[in-house]
Amino acid sequence: MSLLIALLQALVLFAVAPLLSGSVRVARARLHNRRGPGVLQEYRDILKLLGRQSVGPDASGWVFRLTPYVMVGVMLTIATALPVVTVDSPLPVLGDLITLIYLFAIARFFFAISGLDTGSPFTALGSSREAMLGVLVEPILLLGLWVAAQVAGSTHISAITDTLYHWPAARSIPLILALCACAFATFIEMGKLPFDLAEAEQELQEGPLSEYSGSGFGILKWGISLKQLVVLQMFVGVFFPWGQMTSFSVGGLLLALVVAIVKLVVGVLIIALFENSMARLRFCATSRVTWAGFGFAFLAFVSLLVA
């Protein structure tokens, strides 16, 4: 049953991933007092791209062509292990925290290298920014989750989620600080303003994506939308596990589905609000701002030691 749930939730997350991007676009347009495109516009764009021929630069190699499939494949793999409707990971063999972090690193590595594989200065610059952002944000996410893992006594995502589900009051301060650090890292990982440095449309014309076209571009856009949804679901599923099933039942499954949708919708609205209240950061100022997130993670670690 757990394997079936893992496969089904991965397919559902894959299917609704463009809907997340479309919802963010609609929310952004409403906050700008514009009508904007519909929530299904992202599906139309991707389907149109999938029907076209994929053309790449002459200098590009196999990494450039393989990256869209790696992005989608890695994110689907992560999606099978996330707690979406259950407190425990439906695929325990992939549920270790270190495994999930390394899978995210693989996707980022291929995305950055694909920009260097084209010979274009725009994609190379976007790739360097993507790599730099990974260096800045991954320690925040890793340290924040590691504090939660220390409270749980295990690096497995099921143990962490179960511990937070019962919320140990004696460890509230380190857990709240770890939550803030991981929320900061999640926002950066989703590539929203003010941290969309690699794909900055005004400066770099989509950065590492600028040389993709046709079906390859459509698959990569779908993969990026899936990554945003997976990152958001990992955060809300681990740090806000209430409403998820502890044991399987039809009523519990229906309730968990409704709660999961509500949590994602609230997350999308909060992200859209923050995204539209800030301008893009200067490239040189990014490292100074990300120190705030690392400060939350470090304070969580110190408070855990003191406690």
In which residue ranges do the predicted regions lie?
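Juxtamembrane/interfacial segments at transmembrane-helix boundaries in multi-pass membrane proteins
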Residues: 93, 147-175
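Juxtamembrane boundary at the C-terminal end of a transmembrane helix
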Residues: 299-307
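Alpha-helical transmembrane segments
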Residues: 6-17, 92-105, 167-189, 255-256
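Mid-bilayer segments of alpha-helical transmembrane spans in multi-pass integral membrane proteins
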Residues: 80, 99-114, 135-151
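Interfacial loop-to-transmembrane junctions
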Residues: 270-297
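Transmembrane alpha-helix boundary signature
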Residues: 57, 76-92, 111-120, 154-155, ...
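Juxtamembrane inter-helical linkers in multi-pass membrane proteins
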Residues: 29, 33-50, 194-217
